[in-house]
Amino acid sequence: MAKLYFYYSAMNAGKTTTLLQSAHNYRERGMRTLILTPKLDHRAGSGVVASRIGLRADGRIFERDTGLQQLVERDIHNDGALHCVLVDEAQFLSRAQVWQLSEVVDRLRVPVLCYGLRTDFRGELFEGSQFLLAWADELEEIKTICHSGSKATMTVRVDAQGHAVQDGPQVEIGGNERYVSVSRAEFKKIMRGEGRIDPLQIALPLPVA
């Protein structure tokens, strides 16, 4: 039975690597997949999904107002049977798009695998993540480690000096130099201004100011 899956984590846990491996596993068995990627994430090039370890694949771009159920229906009409839809950076989905993906599962009987962040740099849920957590059939955390050795569950945005950025837009694309995964305790610490973090040396502990 087709299901809606949400694989969530903090930054740098290997979400995109896992997505690309899943897509490869389907294709290896002669099954066709469709990878969806948000237009605003163009770090690897428009329509390209790429992991930090070098894996890459072409994806279909969607915008915030794209009807995803209709997109999938057109894909099936044009290219034939579809065995899986995979969504990269799923935190950027709108509420309506999460519902549309649930319709892909329930009406079209195509499994949908979504990969994304759970919370933003303020510790608040993204819209897409909020409704995936509410509506997905299966939830799975992809784990990663904080420099403190604890499980990283939060993402902090830092400036060039390694200090926490607490204001600004929720959606701002950046790589390892802007965002760092930390435990909840370390998140509280740096948000209080107690030290700094070097985003290029994420193994180092936070020094106390």
Swiss-Prot record:
Organism superkingdom: Bacteria
GO molecular-function terms, A-Z:
ATP binding; thymidine kinase activity
- Locate the active site: E89 (proton acceptor)
Keywords from the UniProt entry: ATP-binding, Cytoplasm, DNA synthesis, Kinase, Nucleotide-binding, Transferase
Q: Which residues bind ATP?
A: S9, A10, M11, N12, A13, G14, K15, T16, D88, E89, A90, Q91
Q: Tell me which EC number(s) this protein carries.
A: 2.7.1.21
List, alphabetically, the GO terms of the cellular component aspect.
cytosol
Q: Which HAMAP family match?
A: Thymidine_kinase
The record's PANTHER family line, in alphabetical order, gives: THYMIDINE KINASE, THYMIDINE KINASE, CYTOSOLIC
Record protein name field: Thymidine kinase
Query: What organism is the protein native to?
Result: Xanthomonas oryzae pv. oryzae (strain KACC10331 / KXO85)
